[in-house]
């Protein structure tokens, strides 16, 4: 996924991605199954997707990183609670498990950003593939 592809996504035009979205492996992996509608603060245009909040989340990753360069589940939940205080621990645990798609037991800032980008790409692809049926009124019954 190139930066040109990302620029076409309206929800992501306000989103700046620190350190770039360069992970080709993540871009080619399958679209995740999470629905952002499950978490109120994870809606497009919500507080999670402002540059200020992304910067805060990145700072939390950098501050709370252990010697492996990643956050375990408890540290992830604690860090995310500082920024997304209205989200339940259960929802953050679910988010952690979905971001940690390779089941290593930890997430990095890059994995988090890659996950969010794939999620928005999947939502945008789904939105583009949907179409509306147009019914013309008055409707007529066509005998078979």
Curated annotation (Swiss-Prot):
GO MF terms, alphabetically ordered: calcium ion binding
Protein name (database record): EF-hand calcium-binding domain-containing protein 8
InterPro entries the UniProt entry points to: EF-hand-dom_pair, EF_hand_dom, WD-EF-hand_domain
Start and end residues of each EF-hand domain: 52-86, 87-122
Species for this entry: Homo sapiens
Chain segments annotated as coiled-coil in the UniProt record: none
Gene label: EFCAB8
Keywords of this entry: Repeat
């Amino acid at each position: 996924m190139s930066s040109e592809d990302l620029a076409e996504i309206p929800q992501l035009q306000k989103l700046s991605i620190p350190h770039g979205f360069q992970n080709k492996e993540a871009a080619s992996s399958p679209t995740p199954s999470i629905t952002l509608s499950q978490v109120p603060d994870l809606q497009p245009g919500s507080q999670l997707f402002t540059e200020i909040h992304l910067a805060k989340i990145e700072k939390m990753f950098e501050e709370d990183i252990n010697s492996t360069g990643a956050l375990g589940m408890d540290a992830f939940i604690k860090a995310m609670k500082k920024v997304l205080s209205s989200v339940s621990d259960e929802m953050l645990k679910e988010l952690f498990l979905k971001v940690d798609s390779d089941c290593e037991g930890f997430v990095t800032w890059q994995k988090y950003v890659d996950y969010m980008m794939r999620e928005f790409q999947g939502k945008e692809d789904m939105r583009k593939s949907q179409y509306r049926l147009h019914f013309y009124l008055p409707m007529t019954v066509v005998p078979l």
